[in-house]
Amino acid sequence: MVMNKQIVLNNYINGSLKQSDLALRTSTICMEIPDGCNGAILVKNLYLSVNPYLILRMGKLDIPQFDSILPGSTIVSYGVSKVLDSTHPSYEKGELIWGSQAGWEEYTLIQNPYNLFKIQDKDVPLSYYVGILGMPGMTAYAGFFEICSPKKGETVFVTAAAGSVGQLVGQFAKMFGCYVVGSAGSKEKVDLLKNKFGFDDAFNYKEESDYDTALKRHFPEGIDIYFDNVGGKMLEAVINNMRVHGRIAVCGMVSQYSLKQPEGVHNLLKLIPKQIRMQGFVVVDYYHLYPKFLEMVLPRIKEGKVTYVEDISEGLESAPSALLGVYVGRNVGNQVVAVSRE
């Protein structure tokens, strides 16, 4: 038996996330899978992904497709892990994997592995597999190419554009020959969008008193594609500025996650005459495209044609403050917790 540090949910989030909503505790775990526990793997967690959707799952949800994290239980999210022991025919000791079953703990016993991917290419940072080569990358790829069906020369708007998904949507759109504008919440992030990720333009939404006016300034001819990560008032302003036959990929609504009374969108009627297609999606429905995604992205990473920014905090103990940083927009790029660098 060894000690196993864990981050647990103290209580359901009620309103704004507080660091006291999470707690560090220590338990023990056996380094071998118990007899009779077939089809399981024991893993050492190396990197954990800290994503906004976790905040949604930490509240009481009335959404069958999203399970709430129960108070007293360990947070579970996407992670990169090393297999230490296996009674599952598909996994062997020593293999590196990424997927959605990594506990916010040093070691996790996964009794029913699913949606776990073996890491074959180790010529890139392992942390990329909770970012550009993991769930955020696949989300950007599926949302932009499968949901938005882009055409060369179209105009694209991305919110939370400096985040784990948005920075990739913008780069994919530029690769495809689109005109891309992003919004973010600081001057540093706006500079990053324009000078590192290659967006055509960007603006700080916190400095805009009227989103509708800001969008008309950046898209005088209207918006063809909107990749929505924030929802709320920005979504309403975007609908006002969408072109006929526009497409909206609803990836997230981070502005609404902790509101006791979510904001309504009051102009949905405009979807009809503008013939706008607005579609929500979850990335797990598109994991069958992962090999195709890797074929496109891996060479471009190695050639420097796609870049990715991470915000890595060290140690499991840093996870609560890292999540709080994501909640208030303090992170720059994909927020990752390095539990162990081996």
From Swiss-Prot:
**Residues that hold NADP(+) according to the record:** 163-166, 189, 205, 229, 251-257, 281-283, 331
* Enzyme Commission number, as recorded: 1.3.1.81
Where it mainly occurs, coarsely classed, is cytoplasm
Q: Name one GO cellular component term.
A: cytoplasm
Q: Which Gene3D superfamilies match?
A: Medium-chain alcohol dehydrogenases, catalytic domain, NAD(P)-binding Rossmann-like Domain
Alphabetically sorted, this entry's keywords are: Cytoplasm, NADP, Oxidoreductase
User: Which GO terms fall under molecular function for this chain's record?
Assistant: (+)-pulegone reductase (NADP+) activity; 2-alkenal reductase [NAD(P)+] activity; NADPH binding
GO process annotations (BP): response to oxidative stress; terpene metabolic process; terpenoid biosynthetic process
Q: What are the disulphide bonds in this sequence?
A: none
Database matches in Pfam families: ADH_N_2 (PF16884), ADH_zinc_N (PF00107)
Write down the chemical reaction(s) this protein catalyses: (2R,5R)-isomenthone + NADP(+) = (R)-pulegone + NADPH + H(+); (1R,4S)-menthone + NADP(+) = (R)-pulegone + NADPH + H(+)
Q: Where in the cell is it found?
A: Cytoplasm
So, what pathway does this thing act in? Secondary metabolite biosynthesis; terpenoid biosynthesis
Q: Record's superkingdom? A: Eukaryota
**How is the enzymatic or functional activity of this protein modulated?**
Not inhibited by (+)-menthofuran.
Expression induction per the record is:
Down-regulated by (+)-menthofuran.
| Activity-pH behavior | Optimum pH is 5.0.
Please indicate if the UniProt record lists Oxidoreductase as a keyword. Answer: yes
**Could you say which protein family the record assigns here?**
Belongs to the NADP-dependent oxidoreductase L4BD family.
Functional description taken from the UniProt entry? Monoterpene synthase that catalyzes the specific reduction of the 4,8-double bond of (+)-pulegone to produce both (-)-menthone and (+)-isomenthone in a 70:30 ratio. Unable to utilize either (-)-isopiperitenone or (+)-cis-isopulegone, or to catalyze the reverse reaction with (-)-menthone or (+)-isomenthone. Has an absolute requirement for NADPH.
What name is this protein filed under? (+)-pulegone reductase
Q: Which organism is it from?
A: Mentha piperita
